[in-house]
Amino acid sequence: MAGILRLVVQRPPGGLQTVTKGVESLIGTDWIRHKFTKSRIPDKVFQASPEDHEKYGGDPQNPHKLHIVTRIKSTRRRPYWEKDIIKMLGLEKSHTPQVHKNIPSVNSKLKVVKHLIRIQPLKLPQGLPTEENMSNMYLKSTGELVVQWHLKPVEQKTHES
């Protein structure tokens, strides 16, 4: 910058306009190489296909309502927006499952960090649990939510003779 100012001071007034025009072109951001560019992956890659449903065992007419999301890779040396999404989804601790709804807003966030996580459908073989069963449930590694039924003792009838 000092060299440009030295040129402005040493040149006659007619040359001043050409130097200032050159400075204006340097001030713009057109000459900066941006590191992150738009992804060149076509949209058809992200669309669901019948082969995917056969391969992964999904039903497009009856999709599952809940996801089990588990972070399986570290967020170190990842961009800040991926770290923010991991924090929003509650996946700071690795290999700890979190349950999320299968809705477009959540799915768009999951798509950004899909290389860091594992997504499984939540299977409910015994149906939706009730409030009383909430303490008697556990989650299998296969994605099944199992309710442990506690048997109540049978009351014995006393015979009066």
Swiss-Prot record:
UniProt KW Mitochondrion keyword: yes
GO molecular-function term, one example from the UniProt record: structural constituent of ribosome
Pfam family, one: Ribosomal_L30
Alphabetized UniProt keyword annotations: Mitochondrion, Ribonucleoprotein, Ribosomal protein, Transit peptide
Location(s) in or outside the cell: Mitochondrion
GO biological process, one term: translation
Signal peptide location: none
SUPFAM superfamilies for this protein: Ribosomal protein L30p/L7e
Transit peptide interval: 1-34
Chief place where the protein resides: mitochondrion
InterPro entries membership: Ribo_uL30_ferredoxin-like_sf, Ribosomal_uL30_bac-type, Ribosomal_uL30_ferredoxin-like
Taxonomic superkingdom: Eukaryota
A GO cellular-component term linked to this record: mitochondrial large ribosomal subunit
Family statement drawn from the similarity comment of this UniProt entry: Belongs to the universal ribosomal protein uL30 family.
Subunit annotation: Component of the mitochondrial ribosome large subunit (39S) which comprises a 16S rRNA and about 50 distinct proteins.
UniProt protein name: Large ribosomal subunit protein uL30m
Organism encoding this protein: Macaca fascicularis
Taxonomic lineage from the root: Eukaryota, Metazoa, Chordata, Craniata, Vertebrata
Chain's gene name: MRPL30
